[in-house]
Amino acid sequence: MKNILIIGCGLIGSSLLRSIVEKKIVKKIFIYEKSKSNIIKIKKLKLPCEVISDFKKIIPNVDLIIFCTPLSEYEKIILKINKYLLPKTIITDVGSSKEKSMELIKKKLKKGIFWTSSHPIAGSEVSGPEHGVKNLFHNKWCILIKERNTNEKHLRALSKFWKKIGSRVAIMDSKKHDTVFSMTSHLPHLIAYNLVKTATDFEKQKNYELIKFSAGGLRDFSRIAASNEIMWRDIFFNNQKNISEVIDLFIKNLLSFKKDIQSKNNKSIIKKLINTKKVRKKIIKLKQDINKPDFGRS
């Protein structure tokens, strides 16, 4: 690869930029960013890239295009770049929900052009190019989506690319991806948002300074609840069916805990608590533990 175009230079886009430069993967990196404030930050930070405003001259000369925007931005951008795309160009994204976005891409992308979707399991509650870090993807999973019409050559090239920046690569189809991450990432984020809302509602109801005394649990959940609201709205809406199913399962288990507490069912609640500890041990054994809780960043 000689040239890469990153569309969207927030946390993920700027971290990719830094990582690509660190690993010396390509000669030139182009950035397309619609936010004027982000463009100012990119220039102030002196990030090693060329910020572009026009796709026409650039797209035919890039080897890889990476969408690092919210899911709701995909359609507009595809329509802008479609006529300049070449079959040789590898196109990917870093979105956290796949089935609906892949359906949209199939409808809007011109014939003969291939899109191979990626999902690096990395992130932070902060956003913007000033928060990007070069080692964000190091030793983190990156899921590549393989469908019936996936271009195998592009898939291999993307796998090689993500491994070069330090990611561990796994391959699955979009349906399995959305099912898995509805539970491991999307539900934990939804719980975080709702826990913080519950805490603020409870504080108003009791008229206590509750937030002031946040313990580790609420503090860590509040960090996740500070994540970008547009990005997470898009994820919730795009993975609506799977998320709704895991919400129902969560409510069922929450009510079961409530019943055990109200009836002081010692045997049942101890069994539940022990079983959840086993999952924690498994996470540590699989080396999925980190110093700073991130509740399945995506």
Task: Go through each PLM region and give its residues.
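NAD(P)+-binding Rossmann beta1-loop-alpha1 motif at the extreme N-terminus of oxidoreductases
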Residues: 1-60
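Residues at the starts of beta-strands that form the adenosine-phosphate
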Residues: 3, 27-28, 114, 141, ...
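Glycine-rich, N-terminal phosphate-binding loop of Rossmann-like dinucleotide-binding domains
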Residues: 68-70, 95, 146
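Internal alpha-helical scaffold of NAD(P)-dependent oxidoreductase catalytic cores
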Residues: 134-220
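Interdomain hinge/lid region at the active-site interface
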Residues: 207-275
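Rossmann-like NAD(P)(H) cofactor-binding subdomain of soluble oxidoreductases
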Residues: 77-130
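Rossmann-like NAD(P)-binding element
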Residues: 56-85, 89-90
